[in-house]
Curated annotation (Swiss-Prot):
Pfam families the UniProt entry points to: FhuF_C
Temperature dependence: Optimum temperature is 45 degrees Celsius with Fe(3+)-nitrilotriacetic acid (NTA) as electron acceptor.
Record carries keyword Oxidoreductase: yes
Protein's name according to its UniProt entry: Ferric aerobactin reductase IutB
pH dependence: Optimum pH is 8.5 with Fe(3+)-nitrilotriacetic acid (NTA) as electron acceptor.
Taxon lineage: Bacteria, Pseudomonadati, Pseudomonadota, Gammaproteobacteria, Vibrionales
Length: 244
């Protein structure tokens, strides 16, 4: 498949997953600082802090832990989704670490690449490479944020793993005929590739009767601290998810 065809498929599948995930191939803005654009080759600390401050302004009652958690989750959701869509729907992988993203008040939506280069390989090979690329990109986010706040690697690791598992659950909904063993093996591959503790796989459950994969997160997004919001269904704080 040509690079052009691969990215056409990637962008089309992205839009089917969610209209907020719109991609493009185009040059980076000449002045990234003026366009709310974050990229690993540019300083993005101010853009990320502006995102944090917009969340603080919108939800002052939620507190600093929520603003930080939400900021991190917003930075990471598109690269994770693109990795999964590329590997499982398009059988390839773009250079995730060079993915640019567009930051708006309280949200991150829209991504782009400079060119149509992509990698081909087996699922296992692509997952291994995706893990390296995501680790590099997320390390960059953490370094940029550490210029103005404290953000621990242990904190981001749990959010990273929950993000990966959340994508696996969505994948299982798109491909309900695949077995539970398949999804659990994929989870192990992703954890190894992303240098995440294998014990976190205990967050996943597969019900043979309903053929459904489910997740109880190890991290809490803290959205319940926002006025009018409740605990998420996969939250570890939810009463239904309390372990006896």
């Amino acid at each position: 498949m040509s690079g052009h065809s691969f990215f056409e498929h990637l962008f089309e599948h992205s839009q089917h997953v969610t209209p907020y995930l719109h991609g493009a191939i185009k040059p980076r803005p000449e002045r990234c600082a003026e366009h709310g654009f974050i990229h690993i080759e540019h300083a993005s600390s101010d853009h990320i802090r502006a995102l944090y401050e917009s969340l603080k302004l919108a939800h002052p009652e939620a507190g600093a832990a929520y603003w930080l958690t939400r900021t991190w989750t917003l930075l990471c959701w598109q690269p994770l989704y693109v990795a999964f869509i590329a590997i499982y729907s398009c059988q390839g992988l773009p250079k995730l670490s060079s993915m640019g993203q567009h930051v708006q008040p309280r949200f991150v939506s829209g991504y782009q690449f400079d060119d149509d280069e992509y990698r081909q390989g087996s699922e296992q090979e692509l997952i291994a490479h995706a893990g390296k690329e995501l680790c590099a990109l997320f390390d960059y986010f953490r370094q940029e944020m550490s210029l103005w706040t404290r953000i621990r690697p242990g904190f981001t690791q749990h959010l990273f793993a929950d993000g990966v598992f959340g994508c696996l659950v969505k994948l299982s909904q798109f491909y309900p005929t695949l077995s539970g063993d398949y999804f659990l093996e994929q989870a192990r591959l992703w954890l190894a590739a992303c240098q995440l503790p294998e014990k976190l796989i205990q967050s996943l459950r597969y019900d043979e009767t309903s053929r459904q994969l489910s997740l109880v997160r190890t991290s809490c997004c803290l959205v319940y601290k926002c006025q009018g919001r409740e605990l998420c269904r996969d939250c570890p704080r939810h009463p239904d998810n309390k372990r006896e």
